[in-house]
Amino acid sequence: KYLNGHSDVVAGVLAGSAAHMRQVMSKELMTLGAAPSPHDAWLLMRGLRTLELRVNRSADNAEKVARFLEGHPRIKRVYWPGLESHPQHALAMRQMKRVAGLMSIELDAPDEAAVERFCDNLQRFLIAVSWGGYESLQWPVCALKGPSGYYTELPFTMIRLYIGIEDADLLIADLEQGLARM
């Protein structure tokens, strides 16, 4: 979805050993498809023209947002390898030029209701999992609760954030007001 940048095309390259590729071709071809449609290919070409600009803007915004969140008293932890406090920061800096806009945070929240208030009060973060577009997104772990409990071992206070290409100061202000209402 990063290649296209508008959350309306999924495409990529599959690479692997010859044995793995044979398995994929024999079992997954009908599910994955062999090639994009002409329209999807055109959408990808259009998106590739702005890929570098979008990725850099998202990375710039993510750094500003991560640094703001790391210093906030209502945030337990920010999981973004661009921060020096991240346990794999040194490795990330050796492997990547930039750190992308995807991060997770843990709120210092007493209960699920507080997490839901935070998420519900965000105005600039849609609830979705379609990372790589232009818009900022949130996906709270508490959304993974079914009738018999959580479908994951992750803490209910964790929220996945994708930081898009909007104005970083507006995103920070939105997060700040959401945290204040938690």
Where are these regions (language model features)?
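Active-site C-terminal subdomain of aminotransferase-like
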Residues: 2-102, 106-142
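PLP-dependent enzyme catalytic core of the Aspartate aminotransferase-like
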Residues: 54, 109, 136-182
